[in-house]
Amino acid sequence: MKVTLIAILTCAAVLVLHTTAAEELEESQLMEVGMPDTELEAVDEERLFECSVSCEIEKEGNKDCKKKKCKGGWKCKFNMCVKV
């Protein structure tokens, strides 16, 4: 009788630990889904900076500012890459 009770309690404990670990894994995977948004924001900032710096460098060289072409649905306007 004691062995059966110990076996049942052990199985219950393992089940609880397994369920908790599965929930934590699911939460961490859900958090990772949001990460590309942050990466996209960083890319947007890089495009904005890249375009304005490119024009400033060309102006200093006594040349007309040829705006750097922005790719992927972006357009260079007023020394900044803007979403088209």
UniProtKB/Swiss-Prot annotation:
Residues 23-47 form a propeptide. Disulfide bonds join C51-C65, C55-C76, C70-C81. It is found in: Secreted. Keywords: Disulfide bond, Neurotoxin, Postsynaptic neurotoxin, Secreted, Signal, Toxin. Residues 1-22 form the signal peptide. One of its GO terms (molecular function) is toxin activity. Pfam families: Toxin_20 (PF08089). GO terms for cellular component: extracellular region; host cell postsynaptic membrane. Expressed by the venom gland. Postsynaptic neurotoxin. Belongs to the neurotoxin 12 (Hwtx-2) family. 02 (Hwtx-2) subfamily. This is U4-theraphotoxin-Hhn1a. It comes from Cyriopagopus hainanus (Chinese bird spider).
